[in-house]
Amino acid sequence: MLKKLTTIIILTSCVAISGTASVKSDKNRIKDREQKIEKQLSSMSLEQKIGQMVQLEVNMITQFDQRYTVTALQKLSVKELSDIISKFDLTNEYDATLMVVSNGKPKSSNDYQYQCLSQAINYKLGFKLDKTKLQNVFQTYRVGSILNMLGGTCASEVDVWNKATNTIQEAALKYSGIPMVYGLDQLHGTTYTAKGTLFPHQIGMVATFNPELAKRMGEISAYETRACGVRWLFSPSMDICRKPSWPRLYESMGEDPYAASVMGEAYLKGLQGDDPNNIDEYHVGTCLKHYFGYGVPDNGIDRTPANVNEQDLREKLFTPFLKAFQNGAIATMTNSSILNGMNGVANKKFLQQWLKDDLEWDGLIVTDWGDIENLYIRDHIAASQKDAIRMAINAGVDMMMVPSQLNYGETLKQLVEDGCVAQERIDDAVRRILRLKYRLNLFDNPYSNDNKYPLFG
C-alpha cells in the first residue's frame, strides 16, 4: 500500500472541536456524549479520576526474564556474557569484551548497550504481559493510558500487537471499568509493526508540496495502526524548524508556516478522518506536537531553551497548530523545552490561556516522555517532584506521560487534598480524557480485530 492564512492570528477565534465549521459533527451525538461524560464524572472517586490522568509505558506491565535484566547482565563476566550473546545469536551485534572491563564490572559508558541487549534478548524470548502487573496498574492505580512499542527495540507482528492491546484493554475494563487508550509514535508510517508501510519523514512529505499525498500517507498510516489495535497517535509533528542544527529537523514541517499549515491539515485529515467526534475503525486520534516553539532552540540542541518575540510566536510558530486545531485535532503534546523562560509543561499562558480559554478548545493536553521530572531535575523551576506535578497540572496539563513511576497519582491526590490543586482542575482534565475516549469510540467498541485490515503492509 503505498485560503490563505492571515499573518496576524486572532486568538479569540473559537475552535472548539464540536463547533468548528471545517469539520463534520452530529450535534445530537455530541450533546449525548457530553451528558454521558458528566454522569460518569459525577460517579467517579478522586482516585479514579486521577488514575485517568496517568499514562504509563508498556514495560510497566510487561513480563521480563529476570536473568536478562540490565542489572543481571551487568554482573556477568566476559565469558558469561559472551555465552549469553552467543546463545541468542547476537554475536554480530554485541561484543562482551567491549562491554565488560577486566575486573568484571561494566563500563558506565556501555549502559545503553546493556539496555539494548536486554531488550533484544527479551524480544527473542517473545513479548509477554504480566497479569499481576496488569491487575496492579488498573485496579490499584486506575491508570487511563498505556504507550510505546512492544518488545523493546524490535517491531512486533500485527497479531502480537492485537493480542497485547486487547489483553491490556480487557484488564482495564475488568479492574477499572473504563477503557484505556493506547498511544504510539507513528511519524512516518507504521514504524513499530513488522511489515508495516514506511514513508519519508515529515520534512520529506512537506517537500512534495502535495496535500493529496500527505492525506494518503495519513490514511495508510491510520489504517495500519488500527490493524494493530492502537487508536491514538502522537502525530503529526507541527513544529516549525528554523534552526538547521536542531537534530529533530527531519520530524518537523520545515520552516514555512503556510506550507506546514496546508500539509499538516491534509496529513491530519488523512489520519483522523472528517469527523473528530466520531473517529471510525479505519482512522486514529491525532496529537499535535510539540506545542509549541520546540523547533527553534537558541543553540540548536534538542530540548534546550528558545527565545522568540511575541509577533513571531503568533505569526509563525503558532500558525500551523492553530490551523490543525481548527480542523479537529483532538489532542496536543507539550513543548519539552523552555520557551521564553518557562518550561512547556508549566506554561499556563500557552496551555490554559491561549489554547483552552481563548480558543475554547475542548481537546486533551498530554506531556511528552518524563517531562514533568525536568521541571525540578533539569530546569530547577520546581523544588521537588510534588511541586513539579502541581505546576504542570495547574498550568493546564490533563494527562501525565510519567511514564515509568507508579507514585504520580498518589502525589497528585495529596496535592488535591492539600488544596494545592483544585478539584475543578481535576474534573476539567478527566472530562477531556473521557471525551477523547468517546471520540475514539472506546466505550462502545473497546477491542480490535486485525482480520478487518486485509490490506495491511
Protein language model regions, located:
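Bacterial Sec-dependent N-terminal signal peptides
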Residues: M1-K27
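Glycoside hydrolase catalytic-domain context in secreted enzymes
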Residues: I17-G457
